[in-house]
Design a protein with these regions (language model features):
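Small/aliphatic-rich secondary-structure junction motif
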Residues: 1-53, 140, 155-156
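Structural beta-alpha unit
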Residues: 12, 72-107, 142-156
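Short, well-ordered secondary-structure micro-motifs
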Residues: 16, 43-46, 96-97, 118-120, ...
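Solvent-exposed polar/charged
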Residues: 25, 100-101, 128
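General small-molecule cofactor/ligand-binding pocket signal
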Residues: 32-34, 83-87, 135-137
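A short acidic, glycine-rich active-site loop
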Residues: 51-66
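Glycine-rich, Arg-bearing micro-motifs that act as flexible, cationic patches
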Residues: 106-128, 139, 143-146
């Protein structure tokens, strides 16, 4: 059993990450922070690369670094308690597959930044495919407060 959170590095996803960490602590289950990357453009029939010359390894390293930085910044001393996972594929598919593999109790996602109260394409996909509850965090949500911390004090 786990809590799975999708992290894309955006401010709303960082808020979702903090909330997911709090949920994982309350439930006494591991936190899994997930990021996805799409493979770079392929080669046409002639064998010459089109588009970017980045490789899958470049994309993976960049995504892993961004996820590690986000978790470290948002969770501080508790960052080492999060299991970080980076996979190639569409974000919604990666989140659902991770949730299934880890028997997630909860999936936490940020709402689309442009529409704070509406789900984006990733969250719509996850909402329809998830086998567990999904918490959708509005993009304007304040950072969560731990249950044992008085209101007004910042979560560290």
């Amino acid at each position: 059993m786990t809590v799975v959170v999708g992290v894309d590095g955006s401010r709303p996803s960082r808020t979702a990450l903090r909330l997911a960490a709090q949920e994982a602590r309350c439930r006494q289950v591991p936190l899994i922070a997930v990021s996805a990357y799409e493979p770079p453009l392929g080669k046409p029939a002639g064998g010459y690369p089109i588009g970017t010359l980045h490789t899958d390894d470049d994309e993976r390293v960049t995504t892993e670094s961004a996820l590690r930085d986000a978790v470290s910044k948002e969770l501080g001393d508790q960052a080492n308690q999060a299991d970080l996972r980076v996979s190639e594929g569409l974000a919604g598919h990666v989140i659902i597959e991770t949730a299934r593999q880890t028997h997630a109790q909860l999936i936490v996602l940020a709402a689309s930044p442009g529409k704070p109260m509406l789900p984006g394409t990733v969250s719509q996909y996850v909402l329809h495919k998830a086998e567990c509850p999904v918490m959708l965090v509005p993009s304007g949500s304040p950072a969560p407060q731990p249950a044992d911390q008085p209101k007004g004090e910042a979560l560290r």
